[in-house]
Amino acid sequence: MRRRFRSGAAILLLGSVPQLLAQTGAARPGTRVLMDAHNCYPYEGRWNDRIERALSGGVPVAIEQDLYWYTDPITHKSWSVVAHQPPLSGKEPTLTTYFFDRIRPIVEKALRSGDRSKWPIITLNLDVKTEEPEHLRAILQMLKDHEDWITTATRTDDIRTQSPLTIRPVLVLTGQSDAQQQIFYDDLRPGDRVLVFGAVHTFDQDPMAATQVLEPARANNYRRWWNNPWNVVEAGGQMQAGAWTPKDMRRLRMLVDHAHAQGLWIRFYTLDGASTEAMTRNGWFANYNFGSEAAVKDRWRAAYQAGVDYIATDQYEELAAYLHALRSVNRR
């Protein structure tokens, strides 16, 4: 079955000027399906190779980073660290050392090449675990330090008025928190660059509610994507999922089509399928496990066919290879 993606005409500009796109080209919702590397960082002193694994399948790719605000108990100095959960030691990597420094050669190569057809090539998905104003401002400063790499919009007087995206190699997404919107958007001056884009609010008290109940708002200048657990597709989520059915596919398509009609990218998390032993050995979580390779591939294929923008998984290499195979078949 062929994917039902909406095509968008890319605007090609001469020289080194970034592409200015109003939700068109590769950045347009519904244009491409990416592997989203869930929890792509070390923790418990293990799994230090996760970012290498995520990048091994090539670009474009999405990478999730969880951020905490750490305060040294002796010096009382504070900084942002990449971590999974407390307790924190202060020895955790920062977003700069773990993520930005690692992707530097990839981004600089992309900037030199002049081929912007696949930009953004890396989506950074921020899961901000603690929202101290100082933490949010520190995150924003780290993004400003890499501003020449990052896809931006222009802060408008009315948030409902979307400015075109200036496309660069990296796109930064974050959560639906109003506290984050305050720092990342509201406190900016009109005309300033918007460096990170929030998720729309999801009203999922009933996860199987109608799409317009779950997500009633169109994309605005700051909120440009929709993040969902899988239980909005299959009741009960991964651990209660049975065989994949046409009814499930219709539900998935409804959610994806609704998001794209609202001008939103859509992400689903987290689609794994492995043995209990493999899940434990790799630091993956049972509540995301469909239980088998066959079961998760049914969902990966369905997500690809429906045009899900970001498929989050812990099985980076497997999903990247599977998407490559599906694209190859689709091109025939």
Locations of regions flagged by a protein language model:
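Bacterial N-terminal signal peptides that target proteins for export
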Residues: M1-A9
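Bacterial N-terminal signal peptides
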Residues: G8-Q19
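Catalytic cores of phosphodiester-bond hydrolases, prominently lipid phosphodiesterases
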Residues: Q23-E64, Y68-R332
